[in-house]
Amino acid sequence: MLAWPAPLLPTLPGSGPVLTLHDTARGEVVPTTPDTTARMYVCGITPYDATHLGHAATYLAFDLVNRVWRDAGHAVHYVQNVTDIDDPLLERAERDGEDWVVLGMRETALFREDMTALRVLPPDDYVGAVESVPRIVAHVETLLDEGLAYVLDDGTGDVYHDIAQAPGFGSESGYDEATMLRFSAERGGDPDRPGKRNRLDPMLWRGRRPGEPSWPGPRGVAGRPGWHIECATIALETIGMGFDVQGGGSDLVFPHHEFSAVHAEALTATVTGEKLPFARAYVHAAMIGLDGEKMSKSRGNLVFVSKLRGEGVDPMAIRLALLAGHYRTDRAWTPDLLAGAEQRLATWRRAVTRDAGAPAAEVLQGLRERLADDLDSPGAIALVDAWAERTLAATADEQEEGAPTIVCDAVDALLGVALQGC
């Protein structure tokens, strides 16, 4: 599957420090320790509707991770999936009387347009669940053969992972059983289904149902894959185990990231004989709210990137508005937030069109330090605000030739905000 065009990254003098990030599994900010190539997997969209600002905030957060790593001298192998077969997609297609394939392709194309407009660096591997079905089936077969999964005894052909045989289950989220059961019911699980060995056992394969698409499956049972095994398979097939960052929204902590890790670690153990970690760090972006509630498709309280673009809003203002809050802080989208970002963008652009400005070296160093410190984008933005104010207010003898160009390039390369005319 094709991703989207990569924006040009300006080359900055020197290099940035080690990136630290908050690891959900350890509950603390830790240094990332990539090898020569940093590896990151970020869970992608289910393409049944347009990109809303909650999505955008998540992908902008991990775009900063990508940029900071590159500035520190790492090559980056970035993988993102597309959940192009799942219940919400099929339900929306049926509701609207539209072919599910056509719906998924259209919304994926719109997502690409939004990411291009927001200047998000594209993944190196952009992989759909549908194209991964043969490998998913092979993985489910392996889990069945090893006695780690079972077929539900109700004639459906549905296959579940037996989490009683998953050492370390729960270590990624740290949730107790009651919390897991609640989130499982709210986020696509089926804890009350009869016949399961454990209420939390996740589905690996859903046997064919009337009116649903299906593919040849494990043990000859046609159907479609479960959600979590899709990401486990795609990660294993692209960047392998022990990658540096597993990323996504905070609503993916459980069950999705927990079970993706369980599946991948079980599959790897069948080969190596030992439990290896799926990811070194689990990093989660907070929610964007509107009118006091989390922005979500199920609630319908959405602000779409494409709609704002269609109204003439500069995508760089959208980007700045979302980066004005820390990625781990739940925050609200308001007209005032966008208006403030538009004003900030205009001020920065005025400042970088000058031939000379306030000294740039400390701004570049400060941007690097702030973003390397668990993606402190509000702190980074405040540094540029202060520089722009000094530049626009200073007299000629207080200014440094070429400083605006350096700041312009730094804002572009590190924050991903393109400033025109510099």
Curated annotation (Swiss-Prot):
Its cofactor is Zn(2+). The keyword Acyltransferase does not apply. A motif ('ERGGDP' region) lies at residues 186-191. InterPro entries: Cys-tRNA/MSH_ligase (IPR024909), Mycothiol_ligase_MshC (IPR017812), Rossmann-like_a/b/a_fold (IPR014729), tRNA-synt_1_cat_dom (IPR032678). The keyword Ribosomal protein does not apply. Residues 185-200 have a biased composition (Basic and acidic residues). Zn(2+) binds at residues 43, 231, 256. Keywords: ATP-binding, Ligase, Metal-binding, Nucleotide-binding, Zinc. GO terms for biological process: cysteinyl-tRNA aminoacylation; mycothiol biosynthetic process. L-cysteinyl-5'-AMP binds at residues 43-46, 58, 81-83, 227, 249-251, 288. Its EC number is 6.3.1.13. Binds 1 zinc ion per subunit. Belongs to the class-I aminoacyl-tRNA synthetase family. MshC subfamily. Catalyzes the ATP-dependent condensation of GlcN-Ins and L-cysteine to form L-Cys-GlcN-Ins. Monomer. This is L-cysteine:1D-myo-inositol 2-amino-2-deoxy-alpha-D-glucopyranoside ligase. It comes from Geodermatophilus obscurus (strain ATCC 25078 / DSM 43160 / JCM 3152 / CCUG 61914 / KCC A-0152 / KCTC 9177 / NBRC 13315 / NRRL B-3577 / G-20). The gene is mshC.
